[in-house]
């Protein structure tokens, strides 16, 4: 059954527009609370609510609290905390569920609601459908004796900081390193600099002055120019860029070069292989560069592809019992350290890997150079049989590129567009293949 409200990462949209309105979020909290009560019959469920720094977080938090408590669910509020911190505390405090109020890397005018089940794992499709089924039902507040309580806890930041530090090798520290940390004026603005400082690094903080409106604004993992300039200006060894909710990572070296999620995953995997740690393999996505796949296999590391989205990477990791995965966008999963993507922990794993390899980031990543890619968006008509139109040309291009390139065709889920991506060892091969396929699709 198709979901009505939940997307691939919870419920998200523009604040003030359905579904990110206080009345809908009230119903969402109530519906989720009802499902929790049904599944947790032995005691009154307790849910943890965290948020990023968007101005709308106050409004949406209040609506969620009202909905949960009306359903008879207790609520613990942490205030601003990264998404992976909410997942960790949900698990560490043995709570029934966790909720993060954030729209990740989007502008302040958007917001969203993301749920975690018991243990800090993402909700299953089945539970999301259960919640959706109850949203449109009439709200029936519990009798006063059964209403939930809400309270704020202190020390959530400190618990999460200690957890992050515990993922770094106990025999090592970061003394001697100068780091610029860009927290995107988001959920990690307070905790991220402290983690690296307490491990011994000299830290220069930027993107650490949220005002409710400046989250992700010309800063963070989706806008690294500010960080690149700060690294050069401060003569730092590395720059660390997080996104608004703290689950993505990009890094910058001392020369101002940016390293995306694919490069950082390679560094971590190579170091684990060097240490003889069995990670099983690495899960990327259909968009992961083929050159990285080849480089990993040269290190003796297996590789497979999932659909785009950290949710699907996580599914493959769990199915295969592998430990490392992620996307070029900076979602990196180290399953032996945390059960969700975590920008701070991922950065610590990269820095630990560089110590293991006794090399800097540029040297390790020189092992492979991304194959050139050509991407073309082709507009189509509703109901157009573009697969049939491109079948013969697609087969030709794939045969020509066998072993030295690949093709990805993806229909957009939000607009009438087919995305054609061809990558190959040589840029002209990629360009020629993409143009031929795009012409075949658009010729109808």
From Swiss-Prot:
It comes from the Bacteria. Keywords: Isomerase, Magnesium, Metal-binding, Phosphoprotein. Its cofactor is Mg(2+). Its EC number is 5.4.2.10. GO terms for molecular function: magnesium ion binding; phosphoglucosamine mutase activity; phosphomannomutase activity. Activated by phosphorylation. Mg(2+) binds at residues 104, 243, 245, 247. Belongs to the phosphohexose mutase family. NCBIfam families: glmM, PRK10887.1. This is Phosphoglucosamine mutase. It comes from Neisseria meningitidis serogroup C (strain 053442). The gene is glmM.
């Amino acid at each position: 059954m198709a979901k009505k409200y939940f997307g691939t990462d919870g419920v998200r949209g523009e604040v003030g527009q359905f579904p990110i309105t206080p009345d809908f979020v009230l119903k969402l909290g109530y519906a989720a609370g009802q499902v929790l009560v049904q599944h947790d019959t032995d005691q009154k469920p307790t849910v943890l609510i965290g948020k990023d720094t968007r101005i709308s977080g106050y409004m949406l938090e209040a609506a969620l609290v009202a909905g949960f408590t009306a359903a008879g669910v207790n609520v613990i509020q942490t205030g601003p905390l990264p998404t992976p911190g909410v997942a960790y505390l949900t698990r560490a405090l043995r709570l029934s569920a966790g909720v993060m109020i954030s729209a990740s890397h989007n502008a302040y005018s958007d917001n969203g609601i993301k749920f975690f089940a018991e243990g800090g794992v993402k909700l299953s499709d089945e539970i999301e459908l259960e919640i959706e089924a109850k949203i449109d039902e009439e709200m029936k507040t519990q009798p006063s004796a059964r209403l939930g309580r809400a309270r704020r806890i202190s020390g959530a930041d400190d618990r999460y900081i200690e957890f992050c530090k515990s993922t770094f090798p106990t025999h090592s520290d970061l003394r001697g390193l100068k780091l610029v940390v860009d927290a995107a004026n988001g959920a990690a603005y307070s905790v991220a600099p402290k983690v690296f400082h307490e491990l011994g690094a000299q830290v220069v903080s930027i993107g650490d002055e949220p005002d409710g409106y400046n989250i992700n604004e010309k800063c963070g993992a989706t806008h690294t120019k500010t960080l690149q300039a700060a690294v050069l200006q401060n003569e730092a060894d590395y720059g660390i860029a997080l996104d608004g909710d703290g689950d993505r990572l990009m890094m910058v070296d001392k020369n101002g070069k940016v390293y995306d999620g694919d490069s950082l995953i390679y560094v971590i995997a190579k170091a684990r292989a060097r240490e003889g740690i069995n990670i099983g393999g690495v899960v990327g996505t259909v968009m992961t560069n083929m050159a990285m796949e080849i480089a990993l296999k040269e290190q003796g590391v297996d590789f497979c592809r999932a659909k785009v989205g950290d949710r699907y990477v996580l599914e493959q990791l769990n199915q295969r019992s592998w430990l490392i995965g992620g996307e070029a966008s900076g979602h990196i999963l180290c399953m032996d350290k945390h059960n969700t993507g975590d920008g701070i922990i991922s950065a610590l794993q990269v820095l630990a890997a560089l110590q293991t390899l006794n090399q800097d980031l540029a040297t390790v990543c020189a092992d492979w150079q991304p194959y050139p890619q050509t991407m073309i968006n082709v507009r189509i008509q509703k109901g157009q049989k573009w697969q049939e139109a491109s079948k013969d040309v697609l087969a030709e291009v794939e045969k020509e590129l066998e072993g030295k390139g690949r093709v990805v065709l993806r229909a957009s889920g939000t607009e009438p567009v087919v995305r054609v991506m061809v990558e190959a060892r040589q840029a002209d091969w990629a360009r020629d293949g993409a143009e031929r396929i795009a012409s075949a699709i658009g010729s109808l």
